C-alpha cells in the first residue's frame, strides 16, 4: 500500500477540522468548498490541495495573479495584503479602489516603483500619503484637482493653478526637465521650478499672462531663451541698412529678456541690395547693433 501523509483543510460548512490520509498521487478532493481551502504546509509533507492553488482568494498564496480578475467584490478586502508583489502589481492590479493606496502596493518592494493612489473626485485628501519615486509623475493617474502627490513635488508634478490664485506653484522644487515638458504651464503664475539653481541656466522662461504688462522681464536665463516672440529683427529694406539678425542670435527688445544683450558678429547678414545708401564695399560688412545703438564690424 502506498505511503500516506496528512493534509488539513477547513470547511465552509463546518468549524471542525478534517484529517485525511493522502495517497502518493495527491490529491483527493478534501473539501466540499474548494475556495475555502487553506493549505497547511507545516502539517502536510507532500500533499497540498490542488483546489487551493487556483483559488482566487487564497490568503496564504496571494500573488499578483490572485489580485487580478479573480479578486472580485466577493473577495475580502484583506486579499493581497500579504503580497510582496513586483512593480507590475502596482500598475495593473484591479484591487485599486477609489480612494486608497492599492493594498498590494503597501509592501516595501512596491513603494519605490510608483504605486500612486487613485484619486476620487469627492475626497480632497486622497493621494497625500504617497511615497513613490519620481517615475510616478509622468504616468500618474491622480487628477490635478484632487491633490498634489507628495512624492512628485520634487519632479514637477505641480497642481493645477486656479485663475484667482496668486500663490500657486510656490512650493515646487523640480528639476530642469520640468521646465520644457511640463503640461502645467498656465497664465496664472510663474512656475517656481524655473527660479531654482537647476533651471536658471537651462532657459526656463516663465509663462506670462496676456494681461501682464511686465511680460518676460524677470527671466535670468541664457541667451538661447531670447529666440522667442520677444525678439524683433530689423528690416532688410531700411534706408539705414540695419543687418538682419538670425534667429540664433536674436536681439531682444527693451521690454523683454535681458536689456544688456548685444548683437554678435555672427548675427549679421549682408545688407540688402534694395537699400540705396548701403552697398558693401568689402568683405567686412557693416553691422549695426540694435541693443547698443553703435556701429561695429562683423
From Swiss-Prot:
Keywords (A to Z) from UniProt: Keratin, Repeat
Tissue expression as described in the entry:
Restricted to a narrow region of the hair fiber cuticle, lying approximately 20 cell layers above the apex of the dermal papilla of the hair root; not detected in any other tissues.
Q: Does the keyword Repeat apply?
A: yes
Q: Which Pfam families match?
A: Keratin_B2_2 (PF13885)
A GO CC term assigned to this protein in UniProt: cytosol
The cross-references to InterPro entries, in alphabetical order and at most eight, read: KAP
Q: At which residues are the sequence repeats?
A: 26-30, 36-40, 57-61, 79-83, 89-93, 99-103, 104-108, 109-113, 114-118, 119-123, 126-130, 136-140, 146-150, 151-155, 156-160, 168-172, 178-182, 188-192, 193-197, 203-207, 225-229, 230-234, 249-253, 256-260, 267-271
Q: Where is this region: 25 X 5 AA repeats of C-C-X(3)?
A: 26-271
Relate the assembly described in the record. Answer: Interacts with hair keratins.
Family of the protein in this entry = Belongs to the KRTAP type 10 family.
Q: What does this protein do?
A: In the hair cortex, hair keratin intermediate filaments are embedded in an interfilamentous matrix, consisting of hair keratin-associated proteins (KRTAP), which are essential for the formation of a rigid and resistant hair shaft through their extensive disulfide bond cross-linking with abundant cysteine residues of hair keratins. The matrix proteins include the high-sulfur and high-glycine-tyrosine keratins.
Q: List the protein's name.
A: Keratin-associated protein 10-11
- Name its species: Homo sapiens (Human)
**Annotated gene:** KRTAP10-11
